[in-house]
A protein has these predicted regions:
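Catalytic cores and adjacent flexible loops of soluble metabolic enzymes
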Residues: 1-195
């Protein structure tokens, strides 16, 4: 982060990558966040839930612990949708009142194993009473652009995911699940996949 700052006027964001284990409790993350925040080279931090394992209940304990450790530095949320938690965990984080940004995916780039879809997330935040000062017309235009591109390229859009509790046990990201299943099928060992 020091080198980035020496090279120019870039913002440096520290990632707190979330997982479930006996070691990774709120105190673990708060201690690590405090160390990152103590650096003058780190401008802000975010809770990165790439595995989509952070429940709304966990956000309600984890985010305040981290925020207490980082003081005035901004804290953002980056919650993937793979098992259905992304939108509700992001909303729970915003409801705490100190989250400075909710990371989203625009149009077809949202949902699935990605981040909450931008227009739906904005609507949900507003429905919950949050002020979201963005240009709705511009957001709609951006979404339309990505939808047109996805259709033209034949790319599948992200779709809302149902809750799947098995991910809380095996913690294998969906981006790993698909090729793993294919490889097991190719080896005639597909029956091992649900294990």
């Amino acid at each position: 982060s020091r080198l980035v700052k020496e090279e120019g006027d870039a913002e440096v964001m520290g990632a707190l990558t979330f997982t479930l284990s006996d070691v990774h409790d709120d105190r673990f993350y708060a201690d690590f966040a405090g160390k990152l925040a103590a650096s003058p080279h780190v401008d802000l931090l975010y809770l990165k839930d790439a595995g989509a394992l952070m429940s709304p209940d966990r956000v309600r304990t984890l985010a305040p612990a981290v925020k207490a450790a980082i003081g005035d530095k901004p804290l953002e949320i980056h919650a993937h949708c793979t098992i259905g938690y992304g939108p509700v965990s992001s909303l729970a984080a915003a409801d705490l009142g100190f989250i400075s940004a909710v990371h989203v995916g625009i149009g077809p780039l949202g949902e699935g194993s990605s981040l909450p879809e931008a227009e739906r997330m904005v609507a949900n935040l507003r429905e919950a009473g949050h002020d979201v000062p963005i240009d709705d017309k511009l957001l709609s235009e951006l979404s339309d652009y990505w939808w047109r591109l996805a259709r033209a390229e034949g790319l599948p859009p992200g779709t809302p995911q149902p809750f799947d509790a098995s991910f809380l046990r095996h913690q294998i990201a969906r981006g790993v699940m698909t090729p793993t299943k294919r490889q097991l099928d190719e080896l005639k060992m597909g029956d091992l996949f649900p294990a």
